[in-house]
A protein has these predicted regions:
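Flexible "cap/lid" subdomain of the alpha/beta-hydrolase fold that forms the substrate-access gate
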Residues: 25-55, 60, 64-202
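Conserved HGGG/HGGXW glycine-rich cap/lid loop of the alpha/beta-hydrolase fold
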Residues: 1-27
């Protein structure tokens, strides 16, 4: 959904575009919060790649899609022929550090649930932290949140935020280091497209 306008500008008569939604988000099946791990997301997306029986692909990944997608491709390395990377990262921090004040706040048990599930919907507030707030209309915010609430996946955004490693000993750190090591071995055409107004990764 995030890249719907980008896809409209691609030569769809020449390329096949596949945009999987992360399991537990969108209209996918409900995933218990405890199952949102880097390893599981990698395994799930790799299963999608296998099911589609793809021969080769050019990968575009942003945010969590970067490491999860690369991790999935590390399990099927012959597929990857090129990459476009957008505001994402690979590897794990070598010191204790929070990605953002929001991540620092919601990682605390109970506090995170209170903020994201009781006090307000994070989708209603995302426009406040966008480089172009006008692009985040009420209708768009509702479309982002609707599948999560309709499918009982309201805990998924918080679980994904807590997956972000805040230090070398975080539960996600080992998987992220492996992804970073894999990326270092790649010798493929690649482009980096960076949005400087990204409030988290810009």
């Amino acid at each position: 959904f995030l890249y719907r306008k980008v896809v409209e500008g691609l030569p769809l008569d020449k390329v096949r575009v596949i945009m999987p939604t992360s399991p537990g988000l969108g209209f996918s099946s409900k995933i218990p919060a405890s199952e949102h791990t880097v390893e599981n997301h990698i395994r799930w997306i790799n299963a999608v790649l296998n099911e589609l029986e793809l021969k080769e692909l050019i990968y575009a990944g942003q945010d969590w899609g970067g490491p999860i997608g690369m991790g999935a491709l590390s399990l099927s390395p012959s597929l990857l022929k090129g990459a476009v990377l957008l505001n994402t990262g690979f590897g794990a921090p070598i010191t204790n550090v929070d990605l953002s004040p929001a991540h620092a706040t919601v990682k605390t048990p109970v506090i995170g649930e209170l903020i994201t599930e009781v006090l307000f919907s994070m989708f209603d507030r995302l426009g406040n932290v966008q480089g172009d707030p006008e692009s985040w209309t009420t209708e768009v915010a509702e479309l982002y949140g609707k599948p999560l609430y309709d499918n009982g996946n309201a805990k998924a955004p918080l679980a994904m935020m807590r997956m972000v490693p805040d230090g070398p000993n975080h539960v996600s750190a080992d998987a992220m280091r492996k992804i970073g090591d894999y990326v270092k071995t790649l010798d493929i055409p690649a482009e980096i497209v960076w949005g400087m107004n990204d409030p988290i990764l810009g």
